[in-house]
Amino acid sequence: MERYDVVLIQEVKDKGQTSISKLWRLLNTTTGEDWGMVKSGRLGKSSRYKEQYVFFYRLQVARLAGSYQVPESRLYAREPFSVQLDYDSYCENDHDYFYYDGSHCEKTVVLMGLHAQPDQAVSELTQLATSIRRVARVFPHADGVVAMGDFNADCSYASEDEREDLEIFSSRHFRSLIPDTADTTSGRSDCAYDRVVVYGSDVMVRDAQVYNFREDLGLSAKVAAKVSDHYPVEFKLY
């Protein structure tokens, strides 16, 4: 996680939230920097199974300007959760994930997380375009919205034909940064489940990719599986 300035973690199931608090403390101590944390409520239609979205961000880089939870409905198993972050473009320091572009020193972006239910991924992703526009209206001063997460947008959950009919992948108003050919899983499957979708022409991004931590860190398949069954998807804002 030290690789990043802002991190979204999904599928947090710990009801007591001790694990996420421990991770927060470790981030602060191991990096030597202060990190902020903002989390959604516990989401899910079953009383026995709920998840949370959690954003971590370097306080040296970003400031939380607001958050928004899409209201509960039957449209999602776990409604999207968004944060608005004001961030410095690093006029005077060496981080390269947010950096000075020569004309601005501060920008604002909305980051939205969605963990789509596998067996209703297509219907949730159909609704996602509407939810993104809604969040853009909630935060009208932001440059735009970046929706991300495990969309389950591939293989048996969302076919190529089904994806072609989805507005987030077909409309000129949206930019999908992770290609269908990507593999975002750390196991034996080869599926582009995890995606990044940008809404708003003022959101400037580059270098979107899947971070294969197993290969980069030289981990065995067994160890990598203990870290996560998905690889992170990453991008740079400028």
Label the predicted regions.
Residues 1-238:
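Divalent cation-coordinating acidic motifs and surrounding scaffolds
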